Design a protein with these regions (language model features):
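Membrane-embedded transmembrane alpha-helical bundles that form the catalytic cores
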Residues: 1-471
C-alpha cells in the first residue's frame, strides 16, 4: 500500500487513526501492530510468514541474550542466531539469485536460479536493519530486551516507517512504546499533519512531476508519453537535463516519503529521527553523506564503522573501514553491479576528501558546492543505470561523449518553471518562509489546507506512482 494513493489517504489512514485514538491506553500498541500487519499484507500477503519469523527470531533471541547475561558463550550464540536469521532472509530474497548469476557469468558455472523469489518483500532492507540493531543493542546492554511480543511487533512493523524508513532503532521509540496514557499531544498531532502534508506535496507535486521529465527524456519501454525521446535519440545536453531531473525526483520522492512517515509517527505519538537535511546544499561529498539518508548512514557508522575501529586506528585503517561501509552501502541498495560500482565510487571520493581534499573544500565558497553537485549527479547516473531499461553504458557515453540529437529547449520551455521551483525547494528557503507563515494561525492553517487539497487532487487524477525506494 502506497501512502500517496486514494485507498491509503481516505480509507486505511483515517480508519487506523480512529481505531488507535479510540482504543484503551493498554491496547494502543495492539491496534498499531494489527493495523500495521494489515498494511503490510495488503500487497505482500505471501510474505507474511517472513515478517512473523523475523519478529519471532529477534524477540526470542533478545530474551535469551538478556537471560544468559552471565554466560558470554550463550549470549554470543543467540546473537548469532538473530544475525543469521535476519541477514539470512535478506540474503535469500535479495541477493541469492544475483550471486548465482554473477558466479555463472564470472566462473562459467551453470547454477540454476532459485524459483519463486523474483519479487523482493517490500521494505525488507529497512526492517531487517531495525531488527539487527535491536538484537545488537540488547547484546551490548544498550537496551533491555522487550518482553511483550506485541510491543516488539509494533516496533518492527509500525506502518509509517515499515516500507522505506526512516530506519528507527528500538531505543529511539522504546520509551514511547511504553507510554500508554497521554502518548500524544495536540501539538504533536498538528506537527504530524503538517509534516505529512508537506511530504505528500513533495511526492505528488514535485517528485512525480519532475519524474515525468525524466521519463519523457530517457523513456521506458511502455511509456505512454507523446514526447517520448529515448536515450539513443537524446543529445548530450538533453541527457544531462534528464539525469538532473532524476536527481531531483529521487530526493523529493524519498524525502517526501520520510517526511510523511515521520509525520504519521508524530500522529501516533512517536518521534522518528530525521532522514534528510538539504543534502543538495552540501559543499563536500563528506557533508552530503551527513545530510542524505541519515538513518542509514548512522546505522552503518554505529554498527559497522565504529566496531571496525572508526577513526581510532590510524589513517590506513580509516580508509579500510570507509571501504567496507561504502561497499555495504552500495550492496544494501540493490543486488546489481551498478549499485556496487556506486558504492565504490563514493568510497573513492570520500577517501580522496579524507586524505587531502577536504581541507581545500572547507576554504572555498562557491566551487565546493558545484563540485559536490556534479559528482552527486554523476553518482545518480550510476544508480539509475541498471536493469530498469536504462542502459548503463549508453547513459555514460551520452553524458561524457558529446553527441547530437533531440535538443533540450522544448523540455526547458515546458518544465523550466518546475525545475526552478524544485531547485528552490532543495534549499532551506522554503523552511524559512514556512517559519514566517506559521506564526499566524490563519496563514498556517490555510497553507496546509491548500497544499493538502491540491496534492489530493493530483492523487485522484493520476495513476499510482510507487515511491522509488520501495525497490530497495
Amino acid at each position: 500500500m502506497v501512502f500517496s494513493t486514494i485507498i491509503f489517504l481516505f480509507r486505511f489512514l483515517p480508519i487506523t487513526l480512529a481505531l488507535y485514538y479510540l482504543a484503551p491506553a493498554k491496547l494502543k500498541n495492539t491496534v498499531l501492530f494489527l493495523c500495521s500487519l494489515v498494511f503490510y499484507c495488503w500487497g505482500e500477503v505471501r510474505f507474511f510468514p517472513v515478517m512473523v519469523a523475523l519478529i519471532l527470531i529477534n524477540y526470542i533471541s533478545g530474551l535469551c541474550i538478556e537471560h544468559f547475561d552471565q554466560k558470554p558463550a550463550l549470549r554470543r550464540t543467540f546473537l548469532l542466531v538473530a544475525l543469521i536469521g535476519s541477514l539470512g532472509m535478506l540474503f535469500y530474497f535479495k541477493y541469492a539469485n544475483f550471486v548465482l548469476r554473477s558466479a555463472n557469468a564470472l566462473l562459467g558455472t551453470a547454477f540454476a536460479e532459485i524459483q519463486g523469489i523474483g519479487t523482493l518483500p517490500l521494505g525488507i532492507s529497512f526492517y531487517t536493519f531495525q531488527t539487527l540493531s535491536y538484537s545488537i543493542d540488547v547484546y551490548r546492554r544498550d537496551v533491555k530486551a522487550e518482553r511483550n511480543i506485541i510491543d516488539f511487533g509494533a516496533y518492527v512493523v509500525m506502518f509509517p516507517q515499515l516500507i522505506a524508513g526512516p530506519i528507527v532503532k528500538y531505543r529511539d521509540v522504546s520509551n514511547q512504546l511504553h507510554v500508554y496514557r497521554h502518548r500524544y499531544s495536540l501539538q504533536q498531532l498538528e506537527e504530524g499533519m503538517t509534516l505529512f502534508t508537506f511530504g505528500l506535496a513533495k511526492k505528488v507535486l514535485l517528485a512525480d512531476a519532475i519524474g515525468a521529465l525524466w521519463t519523457d527524456i530517457i523513456g521506458v519501454a511502455d511509456s505512454p508519453s507523446t514526447t517520448f525521446v529515448g536515450l539513443a535519440n537524446a543529445s548530450t545536453p538533453l541527457v544531462w537535463l534528464g539525469i538532473i531531473a532524476y536527481s531531483l525526483q529521487l530526493y523529493f520522492d524519498f524525502s517526501g516519503y520520510s517526511m510523511m512517515g515521520i509525520g504519521m509517527g508524530k500522529m501516533l505519538g512517536f518521534d522518528f529521527p530525521a532522514n534528510f537535511n538539504y543534502p543538495y546544499i552540501s559543499a563536500s561529498i563528506t557533508e552530503f553523506w551527513r545530510r542524505w539518508h541519515m538513518t542509514l548512514s548512522g546505522w552503518f557508522r554505529e554498527y559497522v564503522y565504529i566496531p571496525l575501529g572508526g577513526n581510532r586506528k590510524g589513517l590506513k585503517r580509516q580508509i579500510f573501514n570507509l571501504f567496507v561501509v561504502e561497499l555495504l552501502t552500495g550492496i544494501w541498495h540493490g543486488a546489481n553491479w551498478n549499485f556496487i560500482c556506486w558504492g565504490l565510487y563514493y568510497f573513492v571520493l570520500l577517501a580522496i576528501e579524507k586524505l587531502f581534499l577536504l581541507q581545500y573544500l572547507q576554504k572555498g565558497k562557491v566551487w565546493p558546492h558545484i563540485y559536490t553537485l556534479f559528482l552527486v549527479v554523476v553518482g545518480w547516473a550510476m544508480f539509475v543505470g541498471n536493469d530498469t531499461g536504462v542502459s548503463f553504458g549508453l547513459l555514460f557515453q551520452k553524458l561524457f561523449v558529446p553527441s547530437g540529437g533531440v535538443s533540450p529547449f522544448y523540455f526547458l520551455r515546458n518544465y523550466g518553471v518546475l525545475l526552478a521551483v524544485s531547485v528552490v525547494c532543495c534549499t532551506p528557503l522554503i523552511e524559512k518562509l514556512w517559519n514566517m507563515l506559521r506564526r499566524r494561525t490563519l496563514t498556517r492553517v490555510a497553507t496546509i489546507l491548500v497544499l493538502l487539497v491540491v496534492s489530493t487532487a493530483y492523487v485522484v487524477g493520476s495513476t499510482n506512482s510507487p515511491f522509488l525506494y520501495f525497490n530497495f
